[in-house]
């Protein structure tokens, strides 16, 4: 459908053969959705809008948690988590991104969170995190000598 809209606008649509390759989840899912006559498209649009609202609320809460519970020190950040898990994951993601320069995978941040809750040290990217008495400390990992 999008290709038709783009073509009608006078733009040549890109053709990515992997979009039709069943080895990829996205191709299989698109085929399944296309054949699902029971799918209520307007209800999906409402659900998507609700998810966008929830995402905005989580972002707002994470920004507030950051300003109230995160301090920057000479070696990294200390985070004194007060918010629910979903918010804390976003705060940890921001800390890792700020220190490491790249956005970590969600599953890696979730593992980091679980380790810190269990008061176990953990690493993510080039960083090390520890549960300290005054909060969670996230710093650059020491340089390894060869």
Give residue spans per PLM region:
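Catalytic subdomain that performs nucleotidyl-dependent activation
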Residues: 1-48
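AMP-forming adenylation/ATP pyrophosphatase catalytic core
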Residues: 46-146
């Amino acid at each position: 459908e999008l290709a038709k809209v783009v073509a009608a606008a006078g733009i040549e649509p890109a053709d990515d053969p992997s979009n039709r390759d069943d080895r990829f989840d996205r191709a299989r899912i698109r085929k399944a959705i296309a054949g699902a006559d029971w799918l209520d498209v307007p209800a999906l649009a409402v659900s998507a809008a609700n998810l966008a609202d929830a995402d905005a609320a989580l972002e707002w809460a994470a920004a507030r948690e950051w300003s109230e519970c995160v301090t920057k020190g000479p070696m990294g950040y200390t985070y004194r988590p007060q918010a629910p898990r979903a918010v804390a994951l976003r705060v940890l993601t921001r800390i890792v991104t700020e220190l490491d320069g790249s956005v970590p995978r969600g599953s890696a941040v979730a593992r980091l969170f679980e380790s810190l809750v269990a008061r176990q040290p953990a690493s993510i990217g080039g960083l090390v995190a520890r549960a300290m008495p005054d909060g969670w400390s996230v710093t650059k990992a020491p340089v390894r000598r060869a």
